[in-house]
């Protein structure tokens, strides 16, 4: 069973990584402030009250509590999948999805909004601003989809 728990420790590491970066952004940036990094990449401090990429940001505050419980429930399901899977890439994928989800859930519970700060763009066209937790979730899900990790053997 210990080997299963080490993957939860990895999830906590990814959650803390996201949290430390967000702490630094909150400490050194003002909301709306933009810092040019490289062509096509800015650091841009925004707060997202919606879901991924700002979807449903206009939804009533009453429904946000439902979203928090839904996200919490989904994280529990992913933890169950983490304990049932057998392959290392599945453990890794579920661990980073859980870590990213916990990072954003923490923001949503404590701050009421998720801090996003990575701004990718080409010319005047910008991708929606996102954060490290979003990257963790997307990478983990891509690993599961590409490798067929949805199959519980």
Curated annotation (Swiss-Prot):
The chain crosses the membrane at residues 5-25, 36-56, 65-85, 87-107, 126-146. It is found in: Cell inner membrane. It catalyses: Release of signal peptides from bacterial membrane prolipoproteins. Hydrolyzes -Xaa-Yaa-Zaa-|-(S,diacylglyceryl)Cys-, in which Xaa is hydrophobic (preferably Leu), and Yaa (Ala or Ser) and Zaa (Gly or Ala) have small, neutral side chains. It is a multi-pass membrane protein. Its EC number is 3.4.23.36. InterPro entries: Peptidase_A8. One of its GO terms (biological process) is proteolysis. Its main location: membrane. Keywords: Aspartyl protease, Cell inner membrane, Cell membrane, Hydrolase, Membrane, Protease, Transmembrane, Transmembrane helix. One of its GO terms (cellular component) is plasma membrane. The keyword Coiled coil does not apply. The active site is at residues 116, 134. GO terms for molecular function: aspartic-type endopeptidase activity. Pathway: Protein modification; lipoprotein biosynthesis (signal peptide cleavage). Belongs to the peptidase A8 family. This protein specifically catalyzes the removal of signal peptides from prolipoproteins. This is Lipoprotein signal peptidase.
